[in-house]
């Protein structure tokens, strides 16, 4: 419950006041101290470089595991499409399918158009499962190299299909 309260405030008037000045004869003394500048040696430079190189390599390795591509389900203009609808990824890279339009969508891989030996049930959503709200996601990581075709079951007839190539 919101409420509004009002109050009256009296503000005093300071008209007719005069500013006064005080003369001071204080002396301020500042002393400075000499600071030795740090010396850079080749040994410490190489050590710092080595630490930085190891940290950079670790960051790249961790970032490589966290790599993901985002595929939008539906265009900003209301179109029924995967955006992008044809792309390539590295083996094991995560694909995040994100409903950005709020229409019911899903991601189903075509069992006839995936590499042999891949279990379509392990990588697809069930055709009856839907991502209904904007921002809902479905994630999958494809580990077998090859070409995978996928579609949105409710909108496949409208051309909402895509293809991913795993390198």
From Swiss-Prot:
Any one Gene Ontology molecular-function term assigned to this protein's record: copper ion binding
Residues annotated as domain Plastocyanin-like: 69-167
Membrane topology: Peripheral membrane protein
GO cellular component: chloroplast; chloroplast stroma; chloroplast thylakoid; chloroplast thylakoid membrane; nucleus; plastid thylakoid membrane; thylakoid; thylakoid lumen
Pfam families: Copper-bind (PF00127)
Binding site for Cu cation: 105, 152, 155, 160
Required cofactor names: Cu(2+)
Domain of life: Eukaryota
GO biological process, one term: response to copper ion
PROSITE patterns: COPPER_BLUE (PS00196)
SUPFAM superfamilies named in the record: Cupredoxins (SSF49503)
Keyword list, A-Z: Chloroplast, Copper, Electron transport, Membrane, Metal-binding, Plastid, Thylakoid, Transit peptide, Transport
Location in the cell: Plastid, Chloroplast thylakoid membrane
Transit sequence range: 1-52, 53-68
Function text: Participates in electron transfer between P700 and the cytochrome b6-f complex in photosystem I. Seems to be the major plastocyanin in Arabidopsis.
The family this protein is said to belong to: Belongs to the plastocyanin family.
NCBIfam families hit by this protein: cyanin_plasto
Name recorded for this polypeptide: Plastocyanin major isoform, chloroplastic
Organism for this UniProt entry: Arabidopsis thaliana (Mouse-ear cress)
Lineage, uppermost ranks: Eukaryota, Viridiplantae, Streptophyta, Embryophyta, Tracheophyta
């Amino acid at each position: 419950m919101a409420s509004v309260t009002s109050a009256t405030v009296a503000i005093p008037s300071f008209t007719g006041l005069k500013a006064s000045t005080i003369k001071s004869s204080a002396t301020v003394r500042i002393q400075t101290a000499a600071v030795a500048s740090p010396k850079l040696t080749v040994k410490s430079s190489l050590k710092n470089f080595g630490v930085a190189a190891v940290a950079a390599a670790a960051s790249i390795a961790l970032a490589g595991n966290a790599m993901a591509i985002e595929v939008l389900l539906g265009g900003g203009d209301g179109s029924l499409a995967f955006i992008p609808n044809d792309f390539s990824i590295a083996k094991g890279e995560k694909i995040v399918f994100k409903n950005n339009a709020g229409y019911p969508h899903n991601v189903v891989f075509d069992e006839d158009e995936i590499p042999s030996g891949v279990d379509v049930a392990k990588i697809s959503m069930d055709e009856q499962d839907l991502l209904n709200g904007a921002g809902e996601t479905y994630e999958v990581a494809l580990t077998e190299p090859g070409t995978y075709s996928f579609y949105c079951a409710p909108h496949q007839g409208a051309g909402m299909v895509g293809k991913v190539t795993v390198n």
